């Protein structure tokens, strides 16, 4: 008998899809804030203005590099739901640092450090750390969501269909985020008039929304899926293959023994570098052409 999709069966899938939308949305918001923050935080910087602005994206994606593998181990240890909630809490903390950076720049804008001939306010460094936390959260959430969506037994669907739908929603978030930055966060404001106080309310609202989503997730029924994570604690970066020894025990091989995985890692490294480099620095180039 063919099972039909119900709200109960689709609930975890829809919840994770919505969180994946948030990941795409905030990833692009972070990158598109480089231009306005270049004026709000770095107006007194001359020689290294673009370099410091680009560090915002560098800090964000540094979170992926340093914390993805750790999240995999955490997932094996505590399961999907607890890892998901911790990931969301990191996102709330990152937005709190964003908010703090705006408040410090607004009320203590004269506090900062001199780097060479340039003055860099403390608010910039706080935003930079918040960007790292946001990247860490995005990496953690992807480690949780991707395998869960692929393995979740939603009636009448295939893994590739579920992944395509979830990724499409994620891409929709990245598509509308620039309009949010220009049409909401800095609506009706010229580049010359951009200031840190315009960041306060948007970041506060986003932080409250993510905090509510985290609370809702903690109350939701998010079942663990058997056979999708390593239960033992002494195995790292290994997969089981078919038995081939005399005793019939399964042999273990490193995941790096798979050639196509190595090629995929190299490919996605260059792809993401190109995607982020062009997308996040195009606005900086446009601002330079306009004399900002």
How should these model regions be labeled?
Residues 1-23, 115-118, 123, 252-257:
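Cytosolic juxtamembrane N-terminal segment immediately preceding the first transmembrane helix
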Residues 11-41, 142-146, 278-286:
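Extracytoplasmic
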Residues 30-34, 253-292:
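Extracytoplasmic gate region of multi-pass secondary transporters
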Residues 89-120:
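C-terminal ends and interior cores of transmembrane alpha-helices
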Residues 161-186:
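Glycine-rich segments within core transmembrane alpha-helices of 12-TM secondary carriers
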Residues 177, 181-189, 202-234, 238:
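C-terminal membrane-cytosol helix-exit motif in multi-pass small-molecule transporters
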């Amino acid at each position: 008998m063919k099972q039909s999709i119900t709200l109960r069966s689709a609930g975890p899938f829809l919840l994770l899809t919505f969180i994946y939308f948030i990941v795409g949305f905030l990833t692009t918001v972070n990158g598109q804030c480089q231009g306005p923050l270049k004026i709000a935080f770095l107006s007194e910087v001359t020689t290294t203005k673009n370099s410091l602005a680009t560090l915002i994206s560098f800090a964000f994606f540094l979170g992926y590099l340093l914390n993805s593998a750790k999240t995999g181990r955490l997932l094996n240890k505590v399961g999907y739901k607890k890892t998901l909630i911790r990931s969301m809490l990191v996102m709330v903390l990152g937005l709190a640092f964003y908010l703090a950076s705006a408040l410090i720049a607004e009320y203590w804008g004269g506090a900062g450090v001199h780097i060479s001939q340039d003055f860099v306010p403390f608010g910039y460094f706080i935003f930079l750390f918040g960007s790292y936390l946001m990247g860490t959260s995005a990496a953690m959430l992807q480690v949780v969501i991707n395998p869960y969506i692929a393995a979740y037994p939603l009636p009448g669907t295939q893994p590739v269909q579920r992944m395509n739908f979830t990724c499409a929603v994620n891409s929709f978030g990245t598509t509308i985020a620039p309009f949010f930055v220009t049409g909401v966060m800095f609506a009706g404001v010229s580049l010359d008039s951009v200031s840190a106080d315009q960041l306060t309310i948007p970041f506060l609202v986003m932080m409250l929304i993510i905090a509510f989503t985290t609370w809702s997730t903690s109350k939701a029924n998010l079942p663990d899926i058997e056979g999708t994570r390593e239960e033992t604690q002494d195995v790292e970066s290994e997969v089981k293959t078919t038995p081939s020894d005399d005793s019939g025990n399964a042999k273990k091989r490193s995941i790096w023994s798979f050639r196509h995985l190595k090629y995929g890692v190299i490919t996605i490294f260059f792809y993401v570098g190109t995607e982020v480099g062009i997308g996040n620095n195009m606005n900086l180039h446009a601002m330079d052409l306009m004399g900002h």
